[in-house]
Amino acid sequence: MRIGVPAETRAGETRVAMTPETAKKLKAQGHTLLVQSGAGLAASVTDAAYEAVGVEISDAAGALSCELVLKVSAPSAEELKHMKSGAALVGMLNPFDAEGLAQLAGAGLTSFALEAAPRTTRAQSMDVLSSQANIAGYKAVMVAADKYQRFFPMLMTAAGTVKAARVVILGVGVAGLQAIATAKRLGAVIEASDVRPSVKEQVESLGGKFIDVPYETAEEKEAAEGVGGYARPMPASWLERQKVEVAKRVAMADVVISTALIPGRAAPVLVTEDMVKSMKPGSVIVDIAAGKAADGVGGNCLLTEAGKTVVKHGVTLVGETNLPALVAADASSLYARNVLDFLKLVITKEGEFKVDMEDDIVAACLMTQGGDV
């Protein structure tokens, strides 16, 4: 079949949905591949690198008019005009964006949102949320180290001793764990907080200290266990106690990295304005949840501004909304492998596209088909 990969048009998006590595494997299966000229340049992939593995270089209309289109983010209204009714689309389409899904259905597309894949062992190799969150956690620490005006590691020099940076990480999912590991490698002293008690061992195994908040009721304990690897909203009583403990650590922190997200819900507020005021001048907050708050601007920190780096009360707040795009080459490589593994479920050995609703991963990812959401 004809598989097209257009250049991403969303502002700041540098990733590409297919690399020469995955293109070579798809080509070996007999597919015709079209990539828009320049689609991979921001991810350090030239048109020549694609051509070397048998990919045809095309314009945007050519790539978008294929039977199967691979993208990173959802297509714009302009891109949808070039897509054929009945075509298939695979990408990170945001399964909670009802308006966006309605547009895809209106265009007659069979679309799959990879973020909706179940958190099962079988689906691990196509888990785009984990592969990209891993990169976000790493880059958040690197960005923080760049903005922070002191060293991360402790140094003992002839001119005196420099203290290690104190880093507090809020939310210990994939991004949080990678942030702990990266900050530890840079020599920081790390504390981490999460609502799930099961992550305490993981935090300590990476060299961090877990900020423990005991549970006082069965309801609190049950909510803390989470579902499908994600946290659930916690009772107000526990959140108040956690806020007190976290506030103490944030006041002493040099760097705060917040990663707390709940699928389909607004990002919880973990850092208030008073907490920012309590921090030392020159401290840094990197908010991975920027733009995911109820207002679409903030994140885990009440003062975060999505897409901007601002200084408030002497604290630098980084609101970068697409950290994986700052590591475009590796982010694209991992994402393209996720896509390739998903395609094995919807393309038969004969090279035909087939939607198998008996497959739990395919059924979970299918967002629109035959004009219906």
Ranges and model annotations:
Residues 6-45, 153-249:
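Glycine-rich phosphate/diphosphate-binding loop of Rossmann-like nucleotide-binding domains
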Residues 115, 121-158, 289-290, 294-373:
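Adenosine-phosphate binding glycine-rich loop
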Residues 4-103, 107:
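An N-terminal-biased, well-structured beta-alpha scaffold segment characteristic
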Residues 83-115, 255-318:
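ADP-ribose/adenylate-binding Rossmann-like module
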Residues 2, 8, 75-166:
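Glycine/serine-rich phosphate-binding loop and adjoining beta1-alpha1 elements at the start
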Residues 54-64, 74-75, 221-256, 260-275, ...:
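A structured beta-alpha segment of the ubiquitous adenosine-cofactor-binding alpha/beta core
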Residues 23, 47, 80, 101, ...:
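Generic hydrophobic/aromatic pocket-lining and core-packing "Φ" positions
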